[in-house]
C-alpha cells in the first residue's frame, strides 16, 4: 500500500518508525543563522521584544512556543490582530497602535509577515528591527529584514507550518532537547494547519501526540478531557475550539491555554472557547445554507469554481464554510464577506487537482491583497472587481476541464476481500498514525452482496455485523442501507472497536456505489412511505427518451427518479445511456448534481441543484409529485407516472395496534424498528411495509409513539384515522 503511494522501500522503515534523530537541521532554512544572532543580541541586552502572530491555531501555537522559550530570558510580549478590526497579517495602522503603548526594539513575526514589505519599512523608520518567520508562499517582493521562511529558497524540507518554523528557531537557539519541550504545542498546529504529514512534520506530530497523551498541559487536558489523543481529535475537537475565538473576534486569550497554569483561569478560558465554538458552528451553518441557496438552480456544467459573496456572512468562518462546499460540490470555492468599509474579504479552499495559490497569483490584478498555499488562501478585493474576477477565475478552470474531475468517485488505496482477517490488518494500520494531509487515513474498497443493515436502536445510524467486521453507516447512509440490496461497493476506513475487553474490526462507510439493484416490492414501498405525508396536485410535462438522452450529453443537471426495481429495469431497457448512469438509492452521495438515477428518494433528498428531474415511475400519491414539482427547477414525466396507492384495512390496523399494546406491556423498550416488526407480527402474516405504514398512521393520530430511545408509548384514546395524512393517502381495503 505504501509503495503504491510512491514511497521507496528504503524510506519505509523511517516512515513507520519516526525518530527525532531524523529531524532536519534548522540551519537548512535561510536566515536562521542571522535570526539566532539577532535574538541572542536581544537577550544579552535585555531588549523588549514583540512577537506578532496570526489568529489561527498555527499562529497561536507559534506564539506560545516562542513566548514559553523567551519569557524568562527577556522582556517579551505578544500581539494577535483582531480579524474584524485589524484584518489579516501585519498593518501599519495596527503597528502604530501598538507602538503608542509599547517600545519594542525587535519584532518577531510568526506564521505571518512574508508579504509585509511596507510594514517592515515602517518599523525600520522607527528604529525597530524585524525578524519575519513564516511558512506562506512569498510573492515578488519579500521584506527587507531577516527572513526565515523555508518556502523562499525551498531547500530540503520546506513544508513546515508557522509553529514548525518557530520550533526550528527554538532548536537553533537552545538545542534539540530544548525544542522537545514544545513538540506537543507544535504538533497541534502541524495537524490543524493541514501541512503534509511527512518528513519533519510526521516526526513532530508523532512525538507531540505522544507527549499530549502522556503529560498534557492543563488547558489542553480540560478542552479534550480524554486519556488518549489522536490526530483526528486534534483536527476535529481541539483545533476548532482554539480557532473559534480568532474567527469571531480576538484570539489573544487563546495563548493562555499554553501559558496559564491556574486552574480557575483555565476553566474560565476553556468554557469561553466552548461557547465561541458553538457560536462559530451556528454562524458557519447559516453561511453554508445561505451559500447553498445561492447555488440552487444554476447550471453546474458552466461552473469551474464557486465564487459567492454576502452581506450577512462573518469573514472569520468562511474558510470552514468553503471547505464544506468543496466537499459537497467537488469544486474550488471562494466566499467573500463585505466589510464595513465596502471591501470584500474572503477565504478560498480547493480540490487536490487545483493549486489555489497559483490560480490566485495568475489573477492578482483583481485583489488588494492575498496569501496562502496550495489548498487554502485568504483574499481581499474591492467589490467593483468581483464580477470580473468570477468570470476570469471560472474561465481559467473551465479551460482546464479536461484535466479536472468534478464528479464523485470512489478512490481507495486497494480492494480488500470481505472474508479477510480485518482485525489483524487494522492493527497493522495503526503504524500509519498520525494520519492527515498527504498521509491520509487509508480507505479501502470492499465489495459485498445482499447485506441487510439494521438500524442502531432508533437512531439514524445503521450497522451490519459479520464475524470478521462490523460495518457502520452514519445517518446519510441509513435510508439506502436499511434495504437489502444487490452488490454494493463500499469505501470504508478501518479501525478497532474495543468493548468490554474485546477487540473487533470496525469499518466506517465513507461512501458507496450500487453496482446492481435488488430491492423487492415490499422494501420499495417501505422506503417510499414518506411520500404519504404529502398533499397537493401536480401537472408534469411529458418528455421523451431522445430528449432525456440529449440532456445527458452534459455531465451535470439531470436526475431520473424511479420508485421500484421494476421501474428502474424498464427505464434501463429504454435507454443504454440511462442504464450507464450511477444509481443512488434513497440518499445522495453529496450535493454535486451529477447525472444519476435516484431509486426511492428519501424525504431529505435535495433536488434543487439539478436543472431537471425526470419522473419515470409511479409514486404512492399525487402529493409527492406536487412536492417534487415545487422543489425542482424543471420536472418532466417519462411515460405514465400516475400514482399507485397502497391499501390498508381498518381490520389490519386494529390487529397491529392490539399486538403493539401486548408486546409493549412485555417489552416496553424496542431494539430497532425491524426487530419490533418481528416481535409484533410474528403471529400472523403482515408485511413489514404495512407494519411501518400502521406505525406512521398511529404516530400521526397520537395512539402510538416511539421515542429515539426505543420506548413505546401507547394511548387508548379514541381517534379519527382520517386525521392522519398518510391514512387519507392510501386506499381503504
Ranges and model annotations:
Residues 1-106, 126-127, 174-391, 405, ...:
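Hydrophobic helix-and-loop "lid/oligomerization" segment in the mid-to-C-terminal part
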Residues 50-52, 105-112, 610-618:
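Acidic beta-strand-to-loop metal/phosphate-binding motif
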Residues 65, 141-192, 199, 627-630, ...:
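Short alpha-helices
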Residues 65-66, 71, 202-240, 244-288, ...:
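Acidic, two-metal ion nucleic-acid-processing modules in DNA metabolism proteins
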Residues 65-165:
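Hydrophobic, small-residue-rich alpha-helical packing segments that form membrane-like cores
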Residues 118-123, 306, 321-324, 570-574, ...:
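A short acidic, amphipathic alpha-helical/loop segment
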Residues 138-145, 571-574, 591-593, 605-609:
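Short loop/helix-cap segments at secondary-structure boundaries that form the rim of catalytic
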Residues 593-595, 599-645:
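Conserved RecA-like helicase motor core of SF1/SF2 enzymes
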